[in-house]
Amino acid sequence: MAYSACFLHQSALASSAARSSSSSSSQRHVSLSKPVQIICKAQQSHEDDNSAVSRRLALTLLVGAAAVGSKVSPADAAYGEAANVFGKPKTNTDFLPYNGDGFKVQVPAKWNPSKEIEYPGQVLRFEDNFDATSNLNVMVTPTDKKSITDYGSPEEFLSQVNYLLGKQAYFGETASEGGFDNNAVATANILESSSQEVGGKPYYYLSVLTRTADGDEGGKHQLITATVNGGKLYICKAQAGDKRWFKGARKFVESAATSFSVA
């Protein structure tokens, strides 16, 4: 009777490594978790009729052992190898979803909720753990408008809610200070404005840089998202000081403001 045996040795042949290094760069290689040498021996009995069967059995075991010992790289999945297509997708840990009354927004994960009330109709406020100048606010107020476009252009809308841009620390007449006009202690420059339809509703987006003569971090970058739904004006405002804006806060402010939507 014929039989075969296969043995796995955890050592690589020098000749095998040499052949692998000399093969064409266009060929696909299967990397091994450990160097594996596979040796199969087939014993032939006196029965000649069973010799072919023994050789086939040995080859089958050889292929099976090679498949078990190999480690498929992720790139091999493109060529038909098994892929972890049912694996859990990666989640963005930089933000946490917040579902409010009639709205939802992505909040930076390292920002804390705050009880400070700064604006009329404020229902939500989060602040940066290290700098309260970086914060997120959501305001909901009644309106007789049917759509955000009833306020006019994005710039005209901003002029009607300019209280969102903050208050200066000095009131009264001044000579020109820090490049400001006479009697002016604050400026607001609209860097960008746009209108976009989401879920069948128009939204206004504005990016504003405000500066005050009393010098607050050189200015604040304020991003505003606004829409109207069900007789209510929804406004989301996220901001960061100019210094932190360029040190990484920008992505958190922009992502939070643009994630805002109403139900």
From Swiss-Prot:
Residues found modified as Phosphoserine: S153
Primary localization class, coarse: plastid
The answer to keyword Chloroplast applying to this record is: yes
A Pfam family = PsbP
Q: What is this protein called?
A: Oxygen-evolving enhancer protein 2-1, chloroplastic
Instruction: Summarize the subunit comment.
Output: Interacts with WAK1.
Gene expressing this chain: PSBP1
Gene Ontology annotations of biological process type = photosynthesis, light reaction
Any idea what job this protein has? May be involved in the regulation of photosystem II.
The record's GO molecular-function terms, alphabetically, read: calcium ion binding; mRNA binding; poly(U) RNA binding; protein domain specific binding; salicylic acid binding
The family this protein is said to belong to = Belongs to the PsbP family.
> What does the UniProt keyword field contain?
Chloroplast, Phosphoprotein, Photosynthesis, Photosystem II, Plastid, Thylakoid, Transit peptide
The membrane spanning regions, by residue number, are: none
Location relative to the cell: Plastid, Chloroplast thylakoid lumen
One GO cellular component term noted in the UniProt record for this chain: chloroplast envelope
Query: Matching InterPro entries, A to Z?
Result: Mog1/PsbP_a/b/a-sand, PsbP_C
Q: Does the keyword Calcium apply?
A: no
